[in-house]
Design a protein with these regions (language model features):
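Conserved catalytic cores and adjacent C-terminal regulatory segments
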Residues: 1-203
Length: 203
């Protein structure tokens, strides 16, 4: 049983519209409550085209594909959902974890047979980073960053050399991530301190 509210992002296959699959009821008039199991939500949010078939929920028969097609960095959705669930409450810690930067200059897209697919993947990764930058520039994100409660971690080198289906290269991903965390030591310490303060306050 899920104790705290959770959601994942998915995309309606028929309309290509982004949706949230929640573990709780939403009363927002423009949002739909989908009845699904955890494993169905997990399949829906990760049903990346070319790798997995679209996922259909057994209850509603709604069909979904990868949530990253629209919401590869759902930081704004997280903030909005939290404010809807707990009106007037403040934020103690927000940790946003990216999937790694992609350098489009290092990819010769014109020489690839699946040009459009690869370009889409690159755009998604770049948009994720742009969304993070946009968030810290707007009033909401700037306030949370200055208050020391918003932290963003996103491996900035090497991840773009590992394709989605290259599970054999997990050691490379580990190495790139460890190197990034070493370079980001001070920010990581601030994040840990913020989380520890939150845990101590609960006791």
């Amino acid at each position: 049983m899920l104790t705290f509210p959770r959601f994942v992002c998915a995309t309606r296959a028929q309309t290509v519209h982004p949706v949230l699959l929640r573990s709780y009821i939403t009363w927002q008039a423009t949002e739909e409550n989908y009845d699904c199991f955890i494993w169905e939500a997990a399949k829906a949010t990760s049903a990346a085209p070319l790798f997995f078939e679209p996922t259909q929920l057994r209850a509603s028969k709604a069909t979904f594909v990868d949530g990253a097609l629209h919401l590869n960095n759902p930081i704004s959705e997280v903030i909005n959902e939290a404010k809807s669930l707990w009106p007037g409450a403040g934020f103690k810690s927000i940790v946003s974890i990216g999937t790694g930067w992609i350098d489009p200059k290092g990819l010769e897209l014109s020489q690839l047979k699946i040009h459009n697919v690869v370009k889409t993947c690159v755009d998604l990764a770049i948009n994720s980073h742009k969304e993070a930058q946009k968030f810290v520039r707007d009033d909401r994100g700037k306030e949370l960053s200055q208050a020391g409660v918003y932290f963003r971690f996103d491996v900035d080198r090497g991840i773009d050399t590992v394709a989605l289906d290259q599970w054999q290269k997990l050691d490379d991903v580990d190495a790139f991530t460890e190197a990034y965390l070493t370079r980001s030591g001070s920010e990581l310490e601030r994040c840990a301190h913020s989380l520890c303060k939150e845990e101590t306050a609960r006791r």
